Amino acid sequence: MSKRLTKAEKAAQAEAAMIAAQNAELAAQADEALNADEAQAVEALAVETEANEAQADEAQPVVLSAEELRAKAEAAQTLLLESVQVRIDNAPSANFAKNMLAELNALSGRNALIAIEKCVELEVDFESLATAYAIADDKAHDYVAIYAAQKIRKSLFALATGMTSVFDGYTRSIMQNLVSLHSLSNRGSQRALSRAIVFDEAMQTEAVRAYKDCAPSTASTQASSTRQAMRFLNVCNVAKSKKDDAMTFTESKAAQKLQAMFNA
């Protein structure tokens, strides 16, 4: 009798191992579009959220209940995914479609939902963001280019987890300077990414530090997409002027959170 029981136990263990391996494979596929810091941060965020949900019944009343907050996050996630799918369906090239599909996968599932929920609390306007995502005309003012889409997604996870390492390196360098200087011109944003960009005497007013060092052409593209991403997330305002654009922080909770992250 004991011999048959041992075989049954072994069979059960083998089945459990197989299920665990399958689950691990699915988890790896879901995290494929995330970098290592992003995946680690999201995993910690999921654990924290589960603990908070377990204590929800004992928590003090809030303006928005946990159920209402989750419902808003689910609606926001649905809007985002629908808009990204529009871009995939209208992709100008196979490579663009591939990149947007990676964004679709990264914004899907429970981990992304948790990050979106955190950003709903930070006053990110997901309806406006989804509307912009759906624009397929690359000449439109609110068109979201692929670099900006990637930065928006990374920034959502960074704000949700409170980890500056989750921002892409270009955005991180620009934000480090903006937090220090409180206002940053377009030229200053590029200087934060490339030491090859030199100010003329009239523009030598910003003590900008280049935490990244790339080609000037790359700096221009990356600075532009970072400004766009921060504007869509209601983190920064961009004031236009004849001399140069200037980026400043908004009064939103997302902007306050970002500044606190870089000042920590």
Language-model regions, residue ranges each:
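N-terminal intrinsically disordered, low-complexity tails
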Residues: 7-64
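Long, low-complexity, charged/polar intrinsically disordered regions in eukaryotic proteins
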Residues: 69-183
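Short, amphipathic alpha-helical interface elements at domain boundaries
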Residues: 179-189, 193-195
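Short helix-coil junctions and helix-kink-helix linkers
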Residues: 196-220
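Short amphipathic alpha-helical interaction segments
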Residues: 214-232
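Short, Lys/Arg-rich nucleic-acid/phosphate-binding segment
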Residues: 240-246
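Short, amphipathic alpha-helical interaction segments positioned at domain boundaries
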Residues: 250-264
